[in-house]
Amino acid sequence: MARYRHSRSRSRSXYRRRXRRRSRYRSRRRRYRGRRRRRSRRGRRRGYSRRRYSRRRRRRY
């Protein structure tokens, strides 16, 4: 009974956590990777440069 209970709870928790962890990690990884890569490469360089240049040009010119 003890072994069966332990293995059953382990498999259930595990399964639930994997699942959950896999789905959450996949969604979070895809979102974080997309946001980080887009923001760090395109967002920071193009976004920040465009915003800063547009603000400077609008203010100066």
UniProtKB/Swiss-Prot annotation:
Keywords: Chromosome, Developmental protein, Differentiation, DNA condensation, DNA-binding, Nucleosome core, Nucleus, Spermatogenesis. Transmembrane segments: none annotated. Residues 1-61 are annotated as: Disordered. Belongs to the protamine P1 family. Protamines substitute for histones in the chromatin of sperm during the haploid phase of spermatogenesis. They compact sperm DNA into a highly condensed, stable and inactive complex. InterPro entries: Protamine_P1. Testis. GO terms for biological process: chromosome condensation; sperm DNA condensation. GO terms for molecular function: DNA binding. This is Sperm protamine P1. Its main location: nucleus. It comes from the Eukaryota. GO terms for cellular component: nucleosome; nucleus. It is found in: Nucleus; Chromosome. The keyword DNA-binding applies.
